[in-house]
A protein has these predicted regions:
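Walker A (P-loop) phosphate-binding loop of ABC-type ATPase nucleotide-binding domains
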Residues: 49-53
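Conserved ABC transporter NBD signature motif
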Residues: 70-81, 85-86, 90
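Helix-to-loop junction immediately C-terminal to a conserved catalytic motif
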Residues: 62
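Conserved ABC ATPase "signature" region
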Residues: 110, 114, 121-139
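Conserved ABC ATPase signature
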Residues: 143-150
Length: 156
């Protein structure tokens, strides 16, 4: 379950950003007191025009950025005080994927597994499971720059 209570995210603007935004305020409210409960099995879509705060909301849920105010919980874990637990429960994938074009999906999986202290045995077993599940085996050793957008999303 995802619980959001009065989520607010305010960005501070520098002078250049204020000029570009044609504003005298040094604050930009990206999300303003959003509340939402998403229960297990439910599917939600965040709809709105550019600048409405959709991506900012998702980044707060995924612990990529911290809320200015409010509370966000994922599976009962607070995104600020229990970020590690939250990240074990969810993933976040944007349409703008930033992967090193020289890497392969196989290399990335090994690299991040080792980075998080996963043993070789567990890493091998988990990689086999996930590559099979997501259909990555056929392109596991191709460089990211050779992959289609869909393949990149699977690798990410």
């Amino acid at each position: 379950m995802i619980e959001i209570k009065n989520l607010t995210k305010v960005y501070k603007l520098n002078k250049k950003q204020m000029k570009e935004s044609k504003t005298k305020s040094n604050r930009k409210v990206a999300v303003d007191h959003l509340s939402l409960n998403a229960h297990k099995g439910e599917i939600y879509g965040l709809l709105g025009p550019n600048g409405a705060g959709k991506t900012t909301t998702l980044r707060c849920i995924a612990t990529i950025i911290k809320p200015t105010e409010g509370e966000v919980k994922v599976a009962g874990h607070d995104v600020v005080t229990e970020a590690e637990q939250v990240r074990k429960s969810i993933g976040f994938l944007t349409s703008d994927i930033k992967l090193d074009p020289q890497f392969t999906p196989d290399y990335m999986f090994e690299f991040f597994g080792r980075l998080h202290g996963v043993s070789k045995e567990v890493l091998k077993e988990r990689k086999e499971q996930l590559f099979e599940y997501f259909g990555i085996k056929d392109f596991a050793h191709k460089q990211i720059k050779e992959l289609s957008t869909g393949m990149k999303q699977k690798a990410a």
